[in-house]
């Protein structure tokens, strides 16, 4: 992939190399009563790592609860229930937080917003992405803007970004 210009032909889904994202603990994350729960009976996890996991779970569960999200126990992903019969909601989720996982969020930006961020640059992105000012996506504003500007993503469509809020990095992105 050309780092200077990521187009539809070059990018279906991209993974960004990142340090420890805590993804190795995904198998121990369960869903109980619409909350993410860490279930590992072995003592092979350091107390510091366990504390980090529990902090993330607490923050994520609070976000899920406060925003009336529903966690799918099979996918371990929280989303809002959207009644698809309403034609006004067909484009729901193109801008904002599309999905919440225990240690990351998927942030969506529509074509217009990607174009605005690309032209405004990283410094101007904070204003354009102000809708993410709270919750687990808040720290993702600069990270997402950095990927858009650094990779010079084309604006033929919207993009999604996976933001790991433990490492505060974008770990993947692709077209909406």
Predicted regions and their residues:
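Short hydrophobic membrane-inserting alpha-helices and related fusion/pore-forming segments
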Residues: 124-142
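Short intrinsically disordered, low-complexity coil segments enriched in acidic
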Residues: 1-8, 125, 129
